[in-house]
Design a protein with these regions (language model features):
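N-terminal hydrophobic or amphipathic segments with adjacent small-residue motifs
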Residues: 5, 17-20, 27, 120, ...
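Active-site-proximal alpha-helix that buttresses catalytic centers in soluble enzyme cores
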Residues: 14-112
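Extreme N-terminal starter segment of soluble prokaryotic enzymes
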Residues: 1-6, 89-90
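Active-site metal-binding loops of divalent metal-dependent hydrolases
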Residues: 11
Length: 163
């Protein structure tokens, strides 16, 4: 059962700094963005680690106890699936590098694997990707005026349905 979903935005990139639409262009984090995700990753990892410790302190019966034949058994599945972990955590991210950098800042601290999924990519801005708003206005003023209709790109609702 899923009891919590947390979505994070990646840290800053050079395109963010230049106010460019990056969409699905694979731009890595800049040094500030890496610092941002390191801070966020540490805070999240601390939150989940201490939440787990507190749950186990309140409910010590949740700690998996080996049965009498444990020393002779080689099947570890029952212990891997035991509730001692408190909750099963899954870290999923877009396949874009900036998103992977962000996910790993959290997951690596807790020793969790990161699963990449292209469907989690940012919204597509079509041919406007990599351009600033001023550049878009200069070459496509009429199209820019219809920005709210997202002509030539993916709508916000398209992103929501993918996520």
């Amino acid at each position: 059962m899923i009891d919590e979903v947390m979505m994070l935005r990646h840290g800053r990139t050079q395109y963010n700094l230049e106010h460019r639409l990056q969409g699905q262009i694979d731009v890595p984090l800049d040094i500030v963005g890496q610092w941002q995700v390191d801070q966020t990753g540490f805070a999240l990892a601390s939150r989940y680690y201490w939440a787990k410790v507190n749950r186990l302190a309140e409910h010590p019966e949740a700690i998996a106890q080996p049965g009498p034949d444990a020393a002779e058994r080689t099947d570890t599945r029952q212990f891997e699936e035991a509730p001692a972990a408190g909750r099963r955590m899954v870290v999923m991210t877009s396949d874009l590098f900036r998103a992977q950098q962000t996910a790993h800042a959290f997951a690596d601290i807790l020793g969790l694997p990161v699963t990449c999924d292209q469907r989690l990519r940012e919204r597509s801005f079509g041919e406007w990707e990599g351009m600033t708003r001023a550049e878009i206005k200069a070459v496509a003023a009429d199209d820019y005026a219809s920005w709210k209709q997202h002509t030539g790109g993916e709508t916000k609702h398209g992103v929501e349905s993918r996520a």
